[in-house]
Every structure is written in structure tokens, then in C-alpha cells.
Curated annotation (Swiss-Prot):
Protein name as it appears in the record: Large ribosomal subunit protein uL6
Task performed by this protein: This protein binds to the 23S rRNA, and is important in its secondary structure. It is located near the subunit interface in the base of the L7/L12 stalk, and near the tRNA binding site of the peptidyltransferase center.
Organism of provenance: Sinorhizobium fredii (strain NBRC 101917 / NGR234)
GO molecular function, one term: structural constituent of ribosome
UniProt xrefs under PROSITE patterns: RIBOSOMAL_L6_1
Record bears the keyword rRNA-binding: yes
Gene that encodes it: rplF
Disulphide linkage map: none
GO cellular component: cytosolic large ribosomal subunit
Keyword rRNA-binding appears in the UniProt entry: yes
Length: 177
């Protein structure tokens, strides 16, 4: 039984929510997002809270119940506060800079990697070894951060590469003579 799905999602102050069938729309200070729930769950707006219920007792419906509730909570947090993901760059000569709206990365290749910033995402470079990805859509922020990290993920011997802030790299020992 889903414990997550049972709790109604309170609409935060400063956010207006509307439910139209399976579509939940949220407008807030950061922007507007919507989520279309699966057909196996029902979504209602009651007493300034969104209530998600499964339509039947199937295992599939129960799985989508908790997921739908979490997605609604994510769009509320996104339009109110937004999401951000920090990346760190380790390595000699590895650095990042902004070239207009594009992110330019020097990661030890023969050429610089240029990453085009998608619509709805803001990328900032406070230091040459730090990248901050922010936006209102949690999935999109995580996807962009993962794409940037993928160019040169951290390697286990020296820890060089792009990693998430706070990520722990499991280090390996080098060859012994």
C-alpha cells in the first residue's frame, strides 16, 4: 500500500493550482508547470490541497498513485522555489565558462566542448571549477546536469572530471611495482 500517495499535497502560499480532468496546472512566482496524471489515478482539488487516489487496486495503479502525487508536489516546489544542481570540475586545466547562453567546457580534449543551454534552464558559472544548473522543472534540471557530467565523468584513479557537488568518488589504487 502506498504511504506516499495517501498524503494530500498542500498548495503552497503564492501558488495557484487548478485541476482539469487528469491535468494539474500550477502557477507561481517562478513560472507555470503542468502534469498530466495517468488514467489509473484520479486527481481532485479539495480544501486547497490536491488529492490523488487510485481508481482500482491493481499493482500498476498503486505504483502510479505514489508517483503521481510526488510529481504534483514537484511542480508546486518548482514554480515556488525552483530547483538547482551544482557540479564541480576537478583536474589540471579543466574549467568552465559561459559564452553567451552556451556553456564552454575545457575538459582535456583537443577541442572545447560547447553545451547549448535548453529553453527553461539557467546555467551559471560562479567559479571556473563550479557550474550551477537551475530551473523550475526538476526532471529537466537533473537531465541537463547529467548531460554535462557525461562529457567527462569522474575517473576513479585521480578523481579528475565533472562530478555533482557532494558526490563521493570511490577511488582505486594504482598499479604497484
Amino acid at each position: 500500500m502506498s504511504r506516499i500517495g495517501k498524503k494530500p499535497v498542500q498548495v503552497p502560499a503564492g501558488v495557484t493550482a487548478s485541476v482539469d480532468g487528469q491535468k494539474v496546472t500550477a502557477k507561481g512566482p517562478k513560472g507555470e508547470l503542468f502534469f498530466v496524471a495517468n488514467d489509473e489515478v484520479s486527481v481532485k482539488l479539495e480544501n486547497n490541497a490536491v488529492v490523488v487516489q487510485p481508481l482500482n487496486e491493481s499493482k500498476d495503479a498503486r505504483a502510479k498513485w505514489g508517483m503521481s502525487r510526488t510529481m504534483v508536489e514537484n511542480i508546486f516546489k518548482g514554480v515556488k522555489d525552483g530547483y538547482e544542481r551544482k557540479l564541480e570540475i576537478n583536474g589540471v586545466g579543466y574549467r568552465a565558462s559561459m559564452q553567451g547562453k552556451n556553456l564552454q567546457l575545457a575538459l582535456g580534449f583537443s577541442h572545447d566542448v560547447v553545451y547549448q543551454t535548453p529553453e527553461g534552464i539557467t546555467i551559471a558559472v560562479p567559479k571556473p571549477t563550479e557550474i550551477v544548473v537551475s530551473g523550475i522543472n526538476k526532471q529537466q534540471v537533473g537531465q541537463v546536469a547529467a548531460e554535462i557530467r557525461e562529457y567527462r565523468g569522474p575517473e576513479p584513479y585521480k578523481g579528475k572530471g565533472v562530478k555533482y557537488a557532494g558526490e563521493r568518488i570511490v577511488r582505486k589504487e594504482g598499479k604497484k611495482k
